[in-house]
């Protein structure tokens, strides 16, 4: 445990003791937050604050603290005006030159995490100069020097910022003093282009030097810079020196290392950098010489020779032999030769390794025909390093003259300029042959190193087409065009100069059209990017399009491609530019006739040579239409139109090919389709039928009626002579101007006229399309079936000698006969109906039909037909001798049916399903709607169909009777399915020993079950997870399932699944059914005894787990009633049976399934008597024993009567109070239960004696039937004997005795275990040894009999001393037990608790006692706990034996009973009452309410706990005081937590404010006088006041300072008179407050400072003020209530002074409303003044005039003090005063200088008018003005003019203008008076 107030320990133990989330935050904070430095060393200074240091922390906000303020102070820095500090300034404040230290602590305000920095202050011991280099260049960037200070221990100071130093240039030992300033100088930062620290800038402004300076080199040489501390205290600290060298910035050209071949040479140049510019220096050099140094030879070199030779005059180096040497600068000044910054170069003399090529431009060996290139040959050594090629090297270069033309070549052969001539692949060669030696050497150095390079030459790149033009579309539709490329390597990179106009892909696809403009598309060769080709791309506006010539008529189904050209026409030049590609533009196709042509969407819009797009249209129906093509959504409407025609294909409908007729018969020939008359020239349409022999036939064109098709052409052809010929039909349009190439179609047929040769009679069948005909007519001698139920149509067909069927034989004479007219007959045997029918050949022929009438009888009949001759008068010659008759034998049968009609077949190869065909002709066609689902075998001999499944699916088996009249097939619906699902149906909760039925079904598709005959093919079986149940197969109940009987054997849970295997071996498993075998369901108690109105809850055990809902019912509801929770309430005396069932509803069947049930016997009684149950009546002192009230019988426990309504009250008393105390239960935790809960008490014995305990049980109402005989009270009493416990005489050494119950055990512990050897033994037992046993190790076991024993415990110490103690052990039975509660509850002084707080966790401890009240040290009792209800307490076993933990979850009283299961009489009952401990009641809380929460709970020290709220945005709560403001609707929970004692809560439901209630003090009103008090408008958001609970002073302060509830409320005011053009906000200032005293919101309305004009307007305003308020959170949600506040405006007068003569009378004009004017009080301060009564103005409403005059003018003039006229009003609390003065003599004749006329004269504008004009206008304006005001003025506004000159406000009565003239129009009336005149003061 970590105690409160314990110091923080910096260890990991603290981290792991935190909650996980706090530990995480702590860990994050520890890792993330740190200071910039851990330690700081500051210099001591006599000048405080001169050396600051900035301390920075990362993240968070910190509070800074210094532990040693006199040594180091710290000043936080706040950023952006916030209170958050992450930085602080350290300043050394030490005044003593000694080493001091301080610790800086930075504490993070949120996490309390501390950061530490150690700061030391010490004296500077020495200083030194720090520099990045010691060398400077002349006229180069300056060098920064910095001072570093160290203390005596060598530690470096953290900062020297702000300290003053003195920098100077000291004398060098090698230089004279006069040269010092010429070599180096010290710069200020302000003179250089560098940014110094801020403190340096400030110091330079004060002409001081800091710890950082700049130095700049002026000329070469050495210089010494010195620095010392300026402060006098450090005058003994030695100055620091640094020696700097100033050099020239010179370099060699080339400056890199050089590689030479033997004999080659190189010339060097020297340049220097001066002020950023490079200047070449001529030889010889002024200050330097060049030397070759450090010659290093390779193996085999001649030591006598150098590697290279140097010509100092020309700086040329010649390679002599292999090796390396250094070319270095040497300063001529000996003192400067140690300089390391002079340039040097290393020269390597090497052997050649190989050659290389380079080419320019492009650097690629992919060239272009016609281009000029520079080819360079490069030499490399064996290490691949490039060698310098001098002019004396010889390289031969070879190339093909066919491919290249050489234009330039150098002498050494390393540089060539060539031109590519033709394309192809060619190889160039180069060979290094020799190097010519100079210096008279005759032997050149020879080499033979060659290299070759393959070169690819391509033609120049050309892009096609030459340019691209695309239309711009405002919707951003892009065009895509692939550019064709010629030349180049074939691999290109593409780019666009303006990608906003055109973009190009890597494949050369150009996308453009979204933005107007032009761009250049560039294609670069990947092999050589310097080669490229380009085209221009234009995106222009489309403003013209046209459809190009095309074919205009076409057959239906054919497609016409219409080419479209689009243009951009220049508006100025009229030049038209055709677009390259506009195929991506969306085209809109419109026709004036819909459906003739449609857009062929599969057609590709593609550009062509003459057009940029095209549209494909398909002919869909005959007709003509005007097709208009336009661009969709374009900025200019571009369109073009053309006419198209579509026609059906020309064909011969009848006959299709050949027409065959008998002599004198007619064939009607029908042709259809072909072109229509061209709509623009219909006169050119033609059609014709031509023949070979005109005399053999007669042709007549048939004019079709209007209802026939218009494109059909019919001709009647009559046979005149026997024979055959060809007829040709042509149709089309002749060519014309408007249709130059029309379509013409033709078709041919043959016409035959012949004699009949044979006849055939067959029944007429309406066979379905696609089926074969009846096979019977093929055999003439076979019986042909016909229906015996319906009349049949017999058909006669006639054939010629070639077996061809005649189209028409109507000229023949026929006769019909029946052999058995009882079965069938003909009504007219000599006539025949000729019916045109297509017999399947596509040609319509005439057939002879005759109806055979049947009589619904089965049998056979012979039908015959005879041919008698032609119907004409004459017959043709040559009639054949063919048969003259035909016959057919018929059998009459019924229709076919299929059995069964529906079936579901399992998809398995071993399954064979048979379908029987009943009746019918016997000739059937078996068809299936699906072909691959089953294999169908038609067994003709058995008249059945066998189906073998092949694939799952649904099909319809159709049986067509081929030889009966077709009415439709006989069908069977068949479903072939695999196993889809296995279904188990059972009750999954089974009581042990019971049986349930298990039904197994196998489902196919669509949840259709299979028949159980397929189960053997499916290998269906059941599988159990465990053997707690058994299964037995039963007889099948139906053909679709298998049934099993399941028997529950053992309690537990198992899983049952059904398994099946399909044809592929795949296993299917049903959804596992979890089966629970549960113990028998039992209701507790078995018998319940109640008094009337008492409630007790039924508990249960056993049954399914988790337990389902128990349904309760009672047999007699007049005795008792039960609710759904099982709470039984007694009503009247009697018995009843309560039934409890666990049941559910089957989802499939909807039936109620009962898992288990039990019953309880309910007995409702009246209390006949009561008795006090005390387990013992003789007790020792200082013990406790519970007592409680019982009824007459043992079943009448406190459960029976403790929860009645009305409640019984229990009153206890004692005869002697000094013997024992009788206290209520839970008194140990300081609870004081009311009398209603005191059915149980605790006896505390105090002293020996005998006393009587009495209890009286009272009922409030005798009619409630609680007590027998309608008594109001019952009582009982018992005697208790208290005696002293046996003790030894020597009371200071009392031996302890161990008390154990029987059959228990106790482990003894001593204080010497582990330090000594401890053993124990039983010395003696009484009455025998079975009382107790001991194992020698301290474990005692009591037996089954009571008795006593003596126990000896011995300790053998290691130091040789033995200790022995002897104690007694008593084994006795347990007499009673007692429940006590924990923890203790504390309340404020003077307050008590009557119930446990809601939400509290409490512990019940069980203690056991013997028959005299002694407490047992161990226990062996099996306890049973019961509650009278389980909805108020959550209770369960504790973490220790014989303890119970409970949580108070709801208000109410729960009776807890506890008893020994073996001895039910040993029991204890306690009431547990739970109530709210937080006040006030929170049932009706509205938004805006302020709640002062309070509780009487405190801790043991009298301190309150901590308040918490679950949702702060609903109830904003101050956690310190417990006051909250309801800000939003919702539910929140307020918690009060006293750590270690109790945590309680209360739920707060905040309702939305239904309406705001406004009120005010009816005695108050609003006014606009400046000194008016604030008006208060009270607002309530709920039903009454908004303050809930009683507030403490601290809570009231929190409401005012922290919560600010007034921010919820917005106040508003508005004048009620809408004609008053003044907003109320200009007059009043309004804000909201919350009044804790009244408990409501207050709108304070105060008067603003007003102008005179505003006061004048308001003085006569007849208006009130509307006031209202709104909640910020619910603005606009609820209806707004407004309240009308009376408004009394203050009176107004603008006169402040009167100047009167002895005869003058002044008029005091006052504006105001009527009630104000009536309450005016006007009085004068001088007796020489007289004020007459007021009079109302007749012209202006609200104007009152008082007449003022001087009574004694002489005396008035002699007054020393001025006189006043005082005007006051009690309503508005106004007081105004007007000064009255006497006129002097000089002012008597100057009337015109005062008043309005003075203003007229003073204005230069008015002087332009004559006096006459003014006077003439005045009368007119007076009349007009008054008339106008009377009409429009609702609120009278009058301006009272001010007169006087030198004294503003003075007034002369005799010269004043009328009172209605206004010199300054008021605000409201200014628009009415501007047209009068304007007067300026």
UniProtKB/Swiss-Prot annotation:
Subcellular location: Nucleus membrane; Nucleus, Nucleoplasm
One GO cellular component term noted in the UniProt record for this chain: membrane
Coiled-coil regions, chain positions: none
InterPro entries: Big_2, Ig_NUP210_4th, Ig_NUP210_6th, Ig_NUP210_9th, Invasin/intimin_cell_adhesion, NUP210-like, NUP210_Ig1, NUP210_Ig15
Free-text tissue specificity from the UniProt record: Expressed in testis.
Signal peptide: 1-32
Any single GO BP term: Sertoli cell development
Keyword Nucleotide-binding: no
Similarity comment text for this entry: Belongs to the NUP210 family.
Membrane topology, from the record: Single-pass membrane protein
Name used for this protein in its record: Nuclear pore membrane glycoprotein 210-like
Knockout mutant characteristics: Knockout animals do not show any overt phenotype. Males and females are fertile, with no age-dependent decrease in fertility. In males, spermatozoa have a uniform moderately abnormal head morphology, frequent flagellar anomalies and decreased progressive motility. They do not show compromised histone removal or nuclear compaction failure.
Transmembrane domains' residue ranges: 1804-1824
Chloroplast listed as a keyword: no
Start and end residues of each BIG2 domain: 1078-1150
Keyword annotations from UniProtKB, A to Z: Glycoprotein, Membrane, Nucleus, Signal, Transmembrane, Transmembrane helix
Organism the protein comes from: Mus musculus
Residue positions the entry lists as glycosylated: 80, 344, 808, 1441
